[in-house]
Swiss-Prot record:
UniProt GO BP: cell division; G2/M transition of mitotic cell cycle; mitotic cell cycle
Post-translational modification: Phosphorylation at Ser-67 by gwl during mitosis is essential for interaction with ppp2r2d (PR55-delta) and subsequent inactivation of PP2A. Phosphorylated by PKA.
Location of region: Disordered: 1-54, 78-117
Subunit structure: Interacts (when phosphorylated at Ser-67) with ppp2r2d.
PANTHER family in the cross-refs: CAMP-REGULATED PHOSPHOPROTEIN 19, ENDOSULFINE
Recorded family membership: Belongs to the endosulfine family.
Protein name (Swiss-Prot/TrEMBL): cAMP-regulated phosphoprotein 19-A
Main localization (coarse): cytoplasm
Organism this protein belongs to: Xenopus laevis
Statement: the UniProt record of this protein carries the keyword Cell cycle: yes
Keywords: Cell cycle, Cell division, Cytoplasm, Mitosis, Phosphoprotein, Protein phosphatase inhibitor
Length: 117
């Protein structure tokens, strides 16, 4: 029985090799056109940095859809450039609930109210 198994395996392998050779000979039309173009223009190929068009567009800078997009991008740049001011206040809010005695006295207004009169 082992002899029969070896024979069937050998037949399967040989048929697989024959099928592969047939597939290699039958080339799709796209592949044949690609081979012709590569033979005609050997210098053309995928460039590592992308296409020239893409590189040129990236060097030009960003284009904006409308003035709103431009203003939003401009505002983001300003926010990044502004240094964050350290808070000078040493008060910590939320430690206790204020009572009327804790609140500072209200300063009198310089302008007299029309309702008080």
């Amino acid at each position: 029985m082992s002899g029969e198994n070896q024979e069937t395996k050998a037949q399967e392998e040989s048929s697989a090799l024959e099928q592969k050779e047939i597939d290699d000979k039958v080339v799709s039309p796209e592949k044949s056109e690609e081979i012709k173009l590569k033979a005609r223009y050997p210098n053309l190929g995928p460039k590592p940095g992308g296409s020239d068009f893409l590189r040129k567009r990236l060097q030009k800078g960003q284009k904006y859809f409308d003035s709103g997009d431009y203003n939003m991008a401009k505002a983001k740049m300003k926010n990044k450039q502004l240094p964050t001011a350290a808070s000078d206040k040493t008060e910590v809010t939320g430690d206790h609930i204020p009572t009327p005695q804790d609140l500072p006295q209200r300063k009198p207004s310089l302008v007299a109210s029309k309702l008080a009169g």
